[in-house]
Structures are given as C-alpha cells and as structure tokens.
Amino acid sequence: MLINKNLKIGIVVEYNPFHNGHIYQLNWIKNNYPNSKIIIVMSHKYSQRGEIICMPFWKRKLWAKKYDVSKVLKLSTRKTIQAAHIFAQNAIQKLNKEKIDILVFGSESTNDSLMLKIATFIKENKEIYNQTLKKNLKGGNSFPKANFLTLKELTNEDFSLPNDILGFEYIKQIVENNYKIQPIAIKRSVGFHSEEPSDEFASASLIRKMLKDGRDVSKYTPVDLKQIPTKLLIENTFLKFKKYILKTPASKLKKYLLVDEGIENLFKKNILLFDNYHDFIDACVSRRYTRSKIMRTYLCILLKIKK
C-alpha cells in the first residue's frame, strides 16, 4: 500500500443510480487515505451496457461532491458504449491524464494481485494469447466468451463475474501502458446484477427494477427517487427505433458504430417480428452476440452514432 501522502485516487463510475454501495466505497477511500483527492470518471447519459442512465449527470455529480469527490470527469457516450476492454481503455486513459496514484474498483473476488499477475502474463505472451483468442473466436464465441475461454485455457483462472471483468480490463490497461497506477480492488457489498438486497445495500440494477415496480428504495440510496421518468426508459424508444430500421437499408445501417458481422441483417430480420424492446433484444442475442453487444448496437443506431 502506498504511503498516505496527498494521493490522487481514481474511480470509474456510472452511479445508475447513486446508492449506499457507492457511499461505502467513497468512505472506504476516505478512511484508508484520509488526505487523498478522489477523482472519478463518470459515464455521461448512457451506461456501458447501452441503457439510459436514470439520473442526470449534474445530479450524480452533485451527490459525488457531497461525499467528498474532488473532481468529476465526463466520459462521452461514444467512449462509454463500448465493449469492456475499450471502455476500460477510454476511462483509464482519462484518469491517467489526471496523474492518479491509485485506482479503486469494486470486485467480487478482490484478487487484484492475481489480476496484475495475469495481465503481465498476457503482455509478455501476446502471441500465444492472440492465437488462442483467435481460435476461440473462430469457434463462434462472442468476444467476452472467447476472452474468458482464452484466460481459462492459459492461466486456469475464472474472470467471469461482471465487476471482475471490468476490473481486470482496467488492470490490463495499466500494465499494457506502463501507467504508474496502483490498482486496489475492494469487496462489493452485493453482486453487480444481484436480485437480492443485503442489509442497506442493493445493486444498481435491483434499485432500477424496484423503481420500475413502484417500490420504495429509500433504504438503499440517499437520493429521493420515486420512479424513473418514462423518457429515461430505453424500452420507450423502441417505436422510434423500429420505424428507422424499417425504412433504412442495411447498407446504411453498416455505417453506424458497432454495426458489424452482419448485425444489420439480424436487426432487419427481427424488427418485423416484435413490438417491444425486450423481446427484440432477446431474439437478437446468440452465442455470437452478447446481450450487452446487442443493447449497445441498438443505442448506436438510435442515436445515429457513426463509425
């Protein structure tokens, strides 16, 4: 652990919404590094998974400042709605420019030393890593699945939990670019997409689900949240999206960010069969395309973000 001088400590966040788990993380930093300056890089309007964030940026920034965050950096939509390794690259680059000393992230396993060891192994054995990854991609696997299988094959380690995936990608960026940043994983209060609360903690996805169901979330967040405004529910964009897909040739859809590997044809085929967002997304998910990939690509077309 670094000597507690006036350190700069970075966190990659979405705060979708801001809740007690985030307060726990910020308090942990303040307790362990009382003289530190906390710098966060926060997604703007949309999450890495391709959903609309349920609190406006300014409000999330306000709550972060209330809990002693010194500086809030904005991660643009283009840089946010990317696969984990590209999202991590964009976020860590931004924090490195701020000359942070430590990166803190929540993790299911908290084994940052093992993650560092494996990231170093990958850097030193790029050829065999890339060959194995290519083999697993050719087997019809999505990139995250192929990456997971490759790591399992080469190191016999399992990084399949959502926050371990992101945490590992952060560490890979630090190692690959020789950033002078010490990564520290702290135990998450609840799982990333956990459907069960724990004492005063609930995952952001569970809080959003509770808000949609009209349930009280005051036990899990200091923010006065009663419901998610309809304009911030991604499912309410489906009619607009459907009209656009129906009238737009596949060749034009290919010009949008993340539209590759024939995904434009898949969208054209399935759009005729479904009348709501969730059924459409479900139908597009396959061994080749993860749910997150489909959701992010949907958003790129909806927002007309070009390559």
From Swiss-Prot:
Predominant cellular place of this UniProt entry's protein: cytoplasm
Binding site for ATP: 12-25, 106, 163, 188
Localization in the cell: Cytoplasm
Key word Ligase present: yes
Pfam families xref list: HIGH_NTase1 (PF05636)
Source organism, top-level taxon: Bacteria
Entry EC no(s): 6.3.4.-
Record field: catalytic activity: cytidine(34) in elongator tRNA(Met) + acetate + ATP = N(4)-acetylcytidine(34) in elongator tRNA(Met) + AMP + diphosphate
GO cellular component: cytoplasm
Gene3D superfamilies for the chain: HUPs
Keyword terms of this UniProt record: ATP-binding, Cytoplasm, Ligase, Nucleotide-binding, RNA-binding, tRNA processing, tRNA-binding
NCBIfam families named among the record's database cross-references: PRK13671.1
Homology family: Belongs to the TmcAL family.
Job description of the protein: Catalyzes the formation of N(4)-acetylcytidine (ac(4)C) at the wobble position of elongator tRNA(Met), using acetate and ATP as substrates. First activates an acetate ion to form acetyladenylate (Ac-AMP) and then transfers the acetyl group to tRNA to form ac(4)C34.
Protein name (database record): tRNA(Met) cytidine acetate ligase
Lineage of source species: Bacteria, Bacillati, Mycoplasmatota, Mycoplasmoidales, Metamycoplasmataceae
Gene name linked to the record: tmcAL
